[in-house]
């Protein structure tokens, strides 16, 4: 009986798992509820998310991964074991091969054959970090990571709304604003959204109308940092591989890649065609799940 491969994208906000032959088998928040009295974990993933904001003082919400970095190894280990057990299921006859996210896996998930001697540039904008890498022959040639990504976008929106409209909003509302009217480029017909929150001065409920142009301004510093990171990687790329990238284009993935106009902004700065892949949020897990197969061909 063949051994299955499972790829895991352990993200700042969400963790996903892909199993060969089954597809995406897990998509849960990277969050844990910890009981301080018993010193045990009460809930993980979606169950923990549902408890957020409703826990008692003897419990604590823990996000063990921040800005793409593991900040609590003990909790992360337990969370990872839980996710793996969920992904495997109870009917597994053999232990699967587990792969954790690697840059090559991102490109594989986007449908690119990284085993060929061609340069591929992938940009993964997650929740905590944005990772940029040039891949060739299933290996990383040059790469960079910047702690500016989806969560940074949300914080920028929170700050802008508080400063310019005197309104306190939560992270969930900032996420909704980003999805509904967020943009990285100027729009000929700006979109609008009614936003409710709490007046900074009076503490009473307040409603304001935001425009997509305001959100573009709020996100400008963050989007510019990502774009300049991509530009910097292109400058460090060997000429032969750079020529391949010009021909093949830039692959954009991750939840942050879904920000309207992000691909266009990168394309304008680099002069290289940029494509946001389908299923941008799950492509990392999908590709990582297939990565072991690719490496097995090389080893064999």
Predicted regions span which residues?
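Nucleotide/phosphate-binding catalytic cleft detector across ATP-hydrolyzing
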Residues: 1-127, 133-251, 257-300
């Amino acid at each position: 009986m063949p051994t299955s491969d499972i790829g895991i994208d352990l993200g700042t906000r969400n963790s996903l798992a892909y199993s060969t032959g089954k597809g995406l088998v897990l998509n849960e928040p990277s969050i844990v509820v910890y009981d301080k009295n018993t010193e045990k974990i009460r809930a993980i993933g979606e169950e923990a998310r549902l408890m957020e904001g409703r826990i008692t003082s003897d419990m604590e919400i823990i996000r063990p991964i921040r800005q793409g970095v593991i900040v609590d190894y003990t909790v992360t280990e337990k969370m990872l074991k839980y996710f793996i057990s969920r992904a495997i299921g109870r009917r597994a006859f053999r232990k699967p091969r587990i792969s954790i996210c690697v840059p090559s896996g991102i490109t594989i998930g986007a449908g690119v054959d990284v085993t060929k001697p061609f340069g591929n540039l992938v940009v993964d904008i997650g929740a905590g970090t944005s990772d940029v890498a040039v891949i060739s022959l299933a290996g990383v040639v040059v790469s960079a990571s910047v702690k500016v990504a989806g969560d940074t976008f949300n914080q920028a929106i929170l700050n802008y709304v508080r400063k310019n409209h005197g309104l306190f909003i939560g992270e969930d509302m900032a996420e909704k604003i980003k999805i509904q009217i967020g943009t990285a480029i100027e729009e000929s017909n700006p979109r609008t959204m009614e936003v409710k929150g709490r007046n900074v001065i009076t503490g009473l409920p307040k409603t304001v109308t935001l425009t997509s142009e305001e959100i573009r301004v709020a996100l400008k510093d963050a989007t510019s940092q990502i774009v300049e990171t991509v530009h910097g990687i292109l400058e460090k790329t060997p000429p032969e591989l750079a020529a391949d990238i010009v021909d093949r284009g830039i692959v954009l993935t991750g939840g942050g890649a879904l920000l309207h106009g992000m691909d266009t902004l990168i394309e304008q700065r680099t002069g290289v065609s940029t494509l946001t892949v389908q299923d941008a949020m799950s492509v990392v897990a999908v590709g990582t799940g297939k990565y072991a197969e690719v490496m097995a061909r090389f080893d064999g």
